[in-house]
Amino acid sequence: MSDQASDPYMYDDDSSSITPEDCWTVISSFFQEKGLVSQQLDSFDEFIESTIQELVWEDSRLILDQPAQHTSEEDHENRRYEITFGKIYISKPTQTEGDGTTHPMFPQEARLRNLTYSSPLYVDMTKRVLKSDDNAGNEHELEWIEEEIKDEEPSTKVYLGKVPIMLRSKFCMLRDLGEHEFYELKECPYDMGGYFVINGSEKVLIAQERSAANIVQVFKKAAPSPISHVAEIRSALERGSRLISSMQIKLYGREEKSTSNRTIKATLPYIKEDIPIVIVFRALGIVPDGDILEHICYDANDWQMLEMLKPCVEEGFVIQEREVALDFIGRRGALGIKREKRIQYAKDILQKELLPNITQDEGFETRKAFFLGYMVNRLLLCALERKEPDDRDHFGKKRLDLAGPLLASLFRILFKKLTKDIYNYMQRCVENDKVFNLTLAVKSQTITDGLRYSLATGNWGEQKKAMSSRAGVSQVLNRYTYSSTLSHLRRTNTPIGRDGKIAKPRQLHNTHWGLVCPAETPEGQACGLVKNLSLMSCISVGTPSEPILYFLEEWGMEPLEDYVPSNSPDSTRVFVNGVWVGTHREPAHLVDTMRSLRRRGDISPEVSIIRDIREKEFKIFTDAGRVYRPLFIVDDDPESETKGELKLQKEHIHKLLNAEYSEEYATNEFGEEEGPYGWSSLVNDGVVEYVDAEEEETIMIAMTPEDLEASKSSLTATQQKSLQLEEQELDPAKRIKPTNSSTTSTFTHCEIHPSMILGVAASIIPFPDHNQSPRNTYQSAMGKQAMGVFLTNYSVRMDTMANILYYPQKPLATTRAMEHLKFRELPAGQNAIVAIACYSGYNQEDSMIMNQSSIDRGLFRSLFFRTYMDLEKRQGMKALETFEKPSRSDTLRLKHGTYEKLDDDGLIAPGIRVSGEDIIIGKTTPIPPDTEELGQRTQYHTKRDASTPLRSTESGIVDQVLLTTNGDGAKFVKVRMRTTKVPQIGDKFASRHGQKGTVGVTYRHEDMPFTSQGIVPDLIINPHAIPSRMTVAHLIECLLSKVSSLSGLEGDASPFTDVTAEAVSKLLREHGYQSRGFEVMYHGHTGKKLMAQVFFGPTYYQRLRHMVDDKIHARARGPVQVLTRQPVEGRSRDGGLRFGEMERDCMIAHGAAGFLKERLMEASDAFRVHVCGVCGLMSVIANLKKNQFECRSCKNKTNIYQIHIPYAAKLLFQELMAMNISPRLYTERSGVSVRT
């Protein structure tokens, strides 16, 4: 750094303060290192690298005891068979072909051949046989001696199954490849990974939101319930089984009714009744009343709380020994067993099931008692109204389960199943005295198929229990536009019933700030339940808590067992992951130490450290699934000379910038080089810090570095006021800066940039801070339907459907966040010249007029690809179906379309023009000789047609044909068809502000209005679209785009910057235009000046995927349903248009009976029935050729009537008959009087 001249980024020395530009440099370094899907990749890597191994070791020993058989003299030994699981091995993804060869697999091949991108998993298994002598007698434990096994190898590597691999994770083939290698592998360098390829389709795991385990929460209960307050905790072990045992402590009696009998009871797992709290304490070995009270109430002078505890102590007065208390609990758990057993049962429950997160070992009763007391204390504080009840929707008390935990829970179930199978095999072998083969014992299909099934269907759980499992966890990755893909990978889901109209969980909560996007959520039933992560938020993968406990013990934490509340009334309680581990007398010092350890990197940066001064609590969380985000640290050390400034200095910015150009390396404390200076170097230098929602509430955050400067510079309040007045006179539209009174200048952190609170879809909106909030939400949904280039390798991909815009442009008004969303490289829209005017009236109600000449020149044209797929089904080695060109002579049931375009191999050649219902893949199935094919079959027909026709509503050109084999070695074909879609009347377009509209009419160039310079707009939208929607940003975008097209620079439309409409107007004026963007226009037909000036300029428009050609539908006659003989439903099946209940009601109200009859019967399912005039049933046998009619049961051949009723009515009558109800139809002429 000494050689300043060579440094390309040297600033003036006086500008030592951090500018917004510097903040963007830091943000750049964040995205360079992390990317946008790091939360998916990190979580999956954690699963592969450590979780699988832990799950395998969780129940790593299978033990089978075989008692002595005593069949012969020698055979008096007990045998014990033992199988142990050891290390696991996983490699890069491979594919085993049908002929048994194995080769490495790349994602593109998996996509094209419909394979699963997965890696084989192996595990070391060891078997031992131990024996013991039976003659030793049964007084003491049997001694197990290793039985000598001749040359048995110590451990065998056994194949467990295949695990799907997430793309771009550490085990993926594409990790850390260069640009050129991507090209050779036909992968797009912009593809960010984070998804799986299962059977050729790309699947994302959506993050699932849940409440955090191991935290105590107190809630109020509503009036009718006898319980007024309840404290609950859902316990889960930190590592290993997700078995959650929950426990509640309930405060009975409502304060209105009575004050005397407000008892407190606990709900214990596996115990049917609620147990009075005092009895639980006594069962835990805390017997005297005084000790119990001391565990609950930490202040002996707090008479209110002691008064609340009086009824509880009285209730438990009858039981005064530990044994009796245990027996009391045991009686209510296990029925009909002896007293000793009951006591042991109660002991086991208290040890293993009560608060298992503290420990499941014995001898920790005091810890559990203190924690129980803490829960009761929290409950009473809430009941005494000294503390608010907890907020269920607080985001800090939520966790997101990503790929790692989700796959872990699945793998655990499957692995348990596998070990059970191994155990059963072992038992069978021992019983039948067979040789035990490890490789045969393991059913590798269990894990392979189980994982694949869940990822393919989204039903998370076992296949057999598909009903109980969660649905929609895994979804097909949305590949419409690049931003829709990104957004899908950062989506979170809250599994609450969608139908319940509960508002609370759906609302935006204060704690969501910076962690989830405030704008991007769907409309309708999932609103607020499906969220998207903000740009810089990450999710913790979880770190072990042991090192932290070790640190705490080093730094003077007193263990909980030694805690005596009366001796140290002011000490602070220390919690780690919700477990109370001890107390500390100097919390401030401890917190500072822990923070500095975290900033130095001795503790993982994702650990959150929370000190609640008021409640005298110090909480540390290290668990997985916490959402956190980075912030700049403000130096608040009173001794430091940079007090009140950012820890981030100019030198850090220089290092970051230089790392891009020179080989500037970060050095760690040992002076070793660690690669270029980047984001992680900033974290290690203690300049930025990760903060989660819970910790965020204990710190003070400045919005921008400027605010920090303002609070630091000690202007008096009056000086600030006068400064503000001056500013206000300059520009009324300027942002109002918060005035910092000198009391609140205790900032500890600073936002990196406020625009980072937005998610992927909302970051594309220019000036979102100038729009009404729902408009941003609408655009966030619509931006995902815009056409663009979804990936650069679209020409080699065979997606089911793909839309590519001919000529996508980057927007003239950009946001800084777009650089990191690759929106410049892969845009989704075009800059259209837009006039906001009424012209001819064809742009009313959100329609717009489009310039036909622009369309002819290629404006908003797009390509559409659709892929058809088929394969030859096989049974074992013989093929059931064959690709061929079916011939009329020997094939049954040929389709309507033409078979002429097929080649002899049954496939169509690329470049051929096809239209609706043409056959593009010819395929036949052999007919077994003995089947009767509904009377159509003759002896010539040996095959049935199974061809694939083109969709009836589409036409185009065959683009690409891929013939290959799938994983089972069956022949397999994909045919891609392409069409050009030209904008026409009825197609849907939208600007980036939720201003959507359809094309109302297209005028040629000469019919459009023009400006004095002869510029003609591409679009004319209606001015009525603006005022009620308040999308001011739409107008500012137009102004800014106009300026940037004149100046040749990109306009910066990022949110929360100092750009004002006034500033943009000034620039526009300097370029010689009217400052507010109005222009004089001339009528296209007459050439006269228009009466009003027209707001005119370029605006970025998106072509959306709803096109009129894909929706147009009409039908006269066509296919009908088999059962009701009414027209089928849906455009794809050429269905009818439903005349529904509401339409029927309108016709009844209108009184148009003839029309009603025609719609509901004649045009639908009219049917002729013959009815017997005697019995009124449809039992007539009619011979229409001979004109003979007869009702056999009535012996009636003359009194018969022909009526017309809807077929559905006939069906109803027959169904009633089947239920033993006889509907009799009498006509006017049958003369039967129906009594009224």
Swiss-Prot record:
SUPFAM superfamilies: beta and beta-prime subunits of DNA dependent RNA-polymerase
Subcellular location: Nucleus
InterPro entries linked to this entry: DNA-dir_RNA_pol_su2, DNA-dir_RNAP_su2_dom, DNA-dir_RNAP_su2_hyb_sf, RNA_pol_bsu_CS, RNA_pol_bsu_protrusion, RNA_pol_Rpb2_2, RNA_pol_Rpb2_2_sf, RNA_pol_Rpb2_3
GO cellular component, one term: mitochondrion
Keyword Nucleus included in the entry's annotation: yes
UniProt keyword Phosphoprotein present: no
Annotated residues for binding of Zn(2+): 1172, 1175, 1191, 1194
GO BP, sorted A to Z: DNA-templated transcription
GO MF, any single term: DNA-directed RNA polymerase activity
Gene3D superfamilies: 2.40.50.150, 3.90.1070.20, DNA-directed RNA polymerase, subunit 2, domain 6 (2.40.270.10), RNA polymerase alpha subunit dimerisation domain (3.90.1800.10), RNA polymerase Rpb2, domain 2 (3.90.1110.10)
Purpose: DNA-dependent RNA polymerase catalyzes the transcription of DNA into RNA using the four ribonucleoside triphosphates as substrates. Second largest component of RNA polymerase II which synthesizes mRNA precursors and many functional non-coding RNAs. Proposed to contribute to the polymerase catalytic activity and forms the polymerase active center together with the largest subunit. Pol II is the central component of the basal RNA polymerase II transcription machinery. It is composed of mobile elements that move relative to each other.
Family: Belongs to the RNA polymerase beta chain family.
Protein name per UniProt: DNA-directed RNA polymerase II subunit RPB2
Source organism of this protein record: Meyerozyma guilliermondii (strain ATCC 6260 / CBS 566 / DSM 6381 / JCM 1539 / NBRC 10279 / NRRL Y-324)
